[in-house]
């Protein structure tokens, strides 16, 4: 396929705005899967993803489209995680694209996640096609959404495509918009190989499978490759594309998206965002944007029955095969027995792992309260990171503690401003911005300690606004805070698993609430 006939794009949207349904309809419209074989949300493989209506891992599918200009095109549609916990994964998937379909619900309008995802797309200088979905609903107001696109997002609304993914309305027009408005990939086949690794997972039969986008050069079966972040070298055994079923090919050329198999035994030998090049004739420098995905939320997982300890360990080991951002280490509690200290990208990530263990491995769990990672600055200027409050007593010569802060964006109906402000004030929030998106809807931005939102902030926000508020956040930095360690005694005995780090002004109330439980 000629390079100028390739279109690589992603669909980004707030949760429940119809991203997966739209992906399904595009697959149907290009006859990639016969309708009788189609199941809803074909790109969402994991049962949990389908059930929750979210995408956890990036998926990709290659679609053929015969356009009105008489030419045949290849669409590489890269489905991305839509949740804040997986922001880095989203950014790497977007780096494999030249454009995005920005889906907005015609009945709900712009939400916090819409803005967060758009900002990621703008950082990658991607072409943006606004897609106003659910126009078949009686409460749909496409003209109002167009105003929002221009006023709030500063996006030209004249090229917005009106669709109903559920009813299949506007799908042909959308595919023509992809041809016209999303540029073909740049790059040169004669250059040294530069391939972006944007996802990887473990296959029981073939080892680790890697999703790549060829940014420069080309890649053939039998060639030796090198991972630039780790220096690991492998021989390419198989290349292919998802159509959406796996289809082998002899090579991947510049601009193409596909998978590779290279006898990679462990997932941690691959890093999402890494650059793959030839080992014998490597490129001069890696692609920009790579960083290690680090756990931000930590919790203890203990089997309710001590007999399940080995099963839990096996379950955690298997989960890390497909999730390199998840970490665990054995720990012992005097009250809870043997368990594991686990690290997650965020609260949703933690919930998904816990649910998978209980559902797939049949282990009933007791989960300790989630905590964030803290920074200790010692009197001699050293910096230490701790993820477990019980480790604080081991540290000597502490000068001060620092905690992570996030920038939170809340979009809420005007009548609930007071409720939101009271909640955020209680969580030590600092207001940075307040903007009316229209007379009825307000955007609020706050700097908040991450520790204040990991427990029940989202639930309290939703219940206080009758479900109308949307919330998103991004990590900013670590800041010095007046933090203390709270220990819990049960019948005079210290229960280390219940220890927590809290702000001095709130430690009494948190201790009282714990005692009530």
Where are the language model's segments positioned?
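Structural and coupling elements of P-loop NTPases
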Residues: 1-517
